[in-house]
C-alpha cells in the first residue's frame, strides 16, 4: 500500500456567519490521481486554498501533513517550496511573455545579477519535452490555445519540483483534442510518481482518470472511495445528498401555437464574406423546448445571435414572431418582441461581474424599476428579491458582487435578469456549462417551469444527454445547415451524431 503524500485532518474554516469547512479529512496517496468532487459551495476551493497557503496557518483549525511531516504554510510561497502547485480554471499566464519566461516567472535562472537566457530557454525546452509539448520556448503565450497554455502551467509546476499538482476544472475551456492531450499527460505524471488532485464537475472524466474519489458536501467529508467501487450515479447521490432518479426532470406538456417561424434564413459574415448560415427553416411553439445540437462550429450560436440581432452579418430570409413578420437588427428590438438570450459565456456577455446581484438582475427591465426616468432603489430591491427567490438563488446578500457567486448561482442571476422581462421566447446557449450536477438539476426544473407557463425555449447544448433528456423536439446543425430533426421519442445519440457530422 502506497503511503500518503498528503493528509489534512480536522480542517475547519469559518467566515463571518458561515462555516465553509467542518472537520474535513482529506488524504491522498503518492502517485495517484485523486478526484475531489462536490457541488459548488461544497468547500472544494476553500479546502485547496487552505492547502496552498492562500488561507494561512492560524486562519483555520486542523493539521496538514506532507509526507508525514506537519506543515504550517503562512503564504503561497511556502506551499510551493513544499512541492504544492495549484492550477486554476482562470490561468495565471502572462500572454505578452514567451513560454520560457512564463515557465520560470518568479524563479528565474540567473547568472550573477542578470537572467541567463541561454540556460532559461534550454531548461524550458527540457520541461516542455517532459510533458510532450513540441513548441518553441520563445513563442509568445498569446499565440497558444487555451489547452496549450494550461500545459505550460503544468510544466511550470514541474519546473518547481511539484510533488502535488492541484487542477481546478482543467478541461472546462478545452477542445476535445486538448482534453485528450491533458489526460495523456496526467497519466504520464502518475507513472512518474507525481500526485494530482483533480477537481471537476465532469464525472465522465473523473470515472476515466481518477484512482480515488473524495466527495465533499456542505463543508464536510462525505466519503473517500476507490473509483472501481463507484458508479457515476453513486457519486452524484453523495454530492447532492439524495438520489437523482432522473438527471433530466422532463415533464410532458401540451404545446401551444407557433410563436416563432424562420423561413429560408441565411447569414453572411461581414468580415470574412463567408455564408455561416445556409437556408435554414424551423419553427418554435409556445411551451415547447426545442433542442439544438451540433458540433463546435456548426453555426448554432451564429444562427440564434443573428435572430436576436447580436451578430454582425448580412441576413436573407423571413422571420415571424406571433404571426407578424419582423426584421430584428439590434438586441433592443428583439427584447421588444419578447425575446431573451442567455449567452454561452455568462461572465463576458451575461453579467457585470463587479456589480451586485440587485443591479444585475434588473439590467434588462429598468423600466420596471424606474419612476419619472429615475431608478427607484426600493422598487429595484423588491423586484430583485422576488425574481431571485423564484430562482432559489443562494447568496449571503443581494448586495454581494456576482463575481463572488458560484457558477450555478451566477447563471441563476442571468436567468433572473431576463425573466424579470417576462419573455415569450427564451434562447439558452449552453445554460449548464461549468456548473455542478445539483445546480444543473435546479436549472432544468426552472426550464420546465417556464415551458409549462407557455414560454417557448430554445436549448442549445453540446451535451447530447442534456438535449435528449430535456427537449420535446431536436434540430441538428452541421456547417450552418439543419441536417436533422427528431421528435423526443425518435432521437438517439447515434442518429444525432450522424447528422452532426454531415451524414443522413
From Swiss-Prot:
It is found in: Cell membrane. Its EC number is 7.5.2.10. Residues 6-243, 260-504 form the ABC transporter domain. Gene3D superfamilies: P-loop containing nucleotide triphosphate hydrolases (3.40.50.300). Pfam families: ABC_tran (PF00005). Part of the ABC transporter complex XylFGH involved in xylose import. Responsible for energy coupling to the transport system. This is Xylose import ATP-binding protein XylG.
